């Protein structure tokens, strides 16, 4: 396929965005859970 050259770039971008977004959501979720447990 001809899209093989541009595909890894999109994959790296996609992994970078989700790699930052997923832990952020999990981090916020854990913080809110800790606050609920303390109260």
From Swiss-Prot:
Against InterPro entries, the record matches this protein to: PSII_cyt_b559_bsu, PSII_cyt_b559_CS, PSII_cyt_b559_N
SUPFAM superfamilies in the record, alphabetically?
Cytochrome b559 subunits (SSF161045)
Q: Which GO terms describe its cellular component?
A: chloroplast thylakoid membrane; photosystem II reaction center
Its needed co-factors are:
heme b
Q: Pfam families attached here? A: Cytochrom_B559
Q: In its UniProt record, which GO terms are filed under biological process?
A: photosynthetic electron transport chain
* Keyword annotations: Chloroplast, Electron transport, Heme, Iron, Membrane, Metal-binding, Photosynthesis, Photosystem II, Plastid, Thylakoid, Transmembrane, Transmembrane helix, Transport
Q: Where are the transmembrane segments?
A: 14-30
Write out the annotated subcellular location: Plastid, Chloroplast thylakoid membrane
User: Main location per UniProt?
Assistant: plastid
Domain of life here?
Eukaryota
Describe the function of this protein: This b-type cytochrome is tightly associated with the reaction center of photosystem II (PSII). PSII is a light-driven water:plastoquinone oxidoreductase that uses light energy to abstract electrons from H(2)O, generating O(2) and a proton gradient subsequently used for ATP formation. It consists of a core antenna complex that captures photons, and an electron transfer chain that converts photonic excitation into a charge separation.
NCBIfam families from the xrefs?
cyt_b559_beta
**Subunit composition?**
Heterodimer of an alpha subunit and a beta subunit. PSII is composed of 1 copy each of membrane proteins PsbA, PsbB, PsbC, PsbD, PsbE, PsbF, PsbH, PsbI, PsbJ, PsbK, PsbL, PsbM, PsbT, PsbX, PsbY, PsbZ, Psb30/Ycf12, at least 3 peripheral proteins of the oxygen-evolving complex and a large number of cofactors. It forms dimeric complexes.
Q: What is this protein called?
A: Cytochrome b559 subunit beta
């Amino acid at each position: 396929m001809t899209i093989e050259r541009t595909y890894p770039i999109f994959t790296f971008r996609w992994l970078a965005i989700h790699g930052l977004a997923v832990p952020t959501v999990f981090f916020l979720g854990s913080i809110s859970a800790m606050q609920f447990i303390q109260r």
